[in-house]
């Protein structure tokens, strides 16, 4: 049976995550309040941040930066925009 939650990011009832996606209290909080749809959107944004900012995930500072951005994305004022990213024009 699908676990339904009220997604804090999308402000609607949606399918919850299958397991906490991150360790610790932040992971538990995300698991309890973020939907699969919102998590997928974060993963796309996170990929843009890594690529555009040329982050090295072996660097502790880069991982801390992403954790901070993730918390801001879901529970704060929103994550940073990817520097240098220009959306395609059609």
From Swiss-Prot:
SUPFAM superfamilies: YggX-like. This is Probable Fe(2+)-trafficking protein. GO terms for molecular function: iron ion binding. The keyword Flavoprotein does not apply. It comes from Janthinobacterium sp. (strain Marseille) (Minibacterium massiliensis). Pfam families: Iron_traffic (PF04362). GO terms for cellular component: cytosol. The keyword Iron applies. Keywords: Iron. It comes from the Bacteria. Belongs to the Fe(2+)-trafficking protein family. Could be a mediator in iron transactions between iron acquisition and iron-requiring processes, such as synthesis and/or repair of Fe-S clusters in biosynthetic enzymes. GO terms for biological process: cellular response to oxidative stress.
